[in-house]
């Protein structure tokens, strides 16, 4: 069954900084708790990650999945679709970066997911919460720290 979640957060960093953190997939293991390994398999004409394999912690084990990134709506939106995954049938989503008047950014994260194995509702909700925590809260911490350092 497809599950969809959307969450927004204000980040005290400009949109360029937030976007750069999201685009720098090779550094995800530095700040995204559950991401253990990243391999960029293909870049687009502008040098941005286009096809990326991830190894992540999930359900007490390791999972591997490959995402195809779409930058056609950049700089405001970065989106991705699952190419293949061992525990997921669908893992599609997007980030949007909306500059605010005070220099901050409203970051929206949307995810559509379907697992390949059945799980109880409470486990799915816990997993969604953990993904959102990493996708937004840990991105916020990383972007704000980078912004404070002038990056």
Predicted regions and their residues:
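Hydrophobic pocket/interface hotspot
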Residues: 18-21, 28, 52, 69, ...
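Beta-strand/loop substructures that line and gate deep hydrophobic ligand-binding cavities in soluble
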Residues: 81-134, 150-151
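Hydrophobic ligand-binding cavity/cleft-lining segments
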Residues: 1-47, 134, 149-151
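Hydrophobic beta-strand positions in extracellular immunoglobulin-like domains
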Residues: 11, 56, 71, 111-113
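Intrinsic-disorder/low-complexity, polar/charged segments enriched in Ser/Thr/Lys/Arg/Asp/Glu/Gln
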Residues: 2-10, 49-51, 64-66, 77, ...
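Glycine-rich portal/gate segments that line the openings of hydrophobic small-molecule binding cavities
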Residues: 29, 39-86, 134-151
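Short, surface-exposed charged micro-motifs
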Residues: 8, 39-40, 68, 94-96
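Short strand-connecting beta-turns/loops that link adjacent beta-strands
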Residues: 14, 45-47, 74, 100-104
């Amino acid at each position: 069954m497809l599950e969809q979640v959307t969450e927004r957060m204000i980040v005290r960093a400009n949109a360029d900084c937030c976007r750069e953190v999201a685009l720098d997939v090779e550094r995800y293991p530095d700040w995204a708790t559950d991401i253990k390994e990243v391999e960029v398999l293909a870049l687009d004409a502008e040098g941005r990650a286009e096809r990326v394999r991830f190894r992540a912690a999930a359900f007490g084990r390791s999972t591997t999945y490959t995402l195809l990134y779409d930058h056609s709506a950049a700089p405001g939106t970065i989106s991705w679709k699952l190419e293949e995954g061992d525990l997921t049938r669908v893992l599609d989503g997007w980030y949007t970066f909306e500059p605010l008047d005070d220099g901050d950014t409203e970051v929206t994260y949307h995810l559509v997911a379907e697992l390949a194995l059945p799980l109880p509702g409470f486990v799915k909700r816990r997993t969604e919460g953990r993904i959102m925590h990493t996708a937004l809260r840990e991105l916020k911490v990383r972007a704000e720290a980078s912004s404070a350092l002038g990056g």
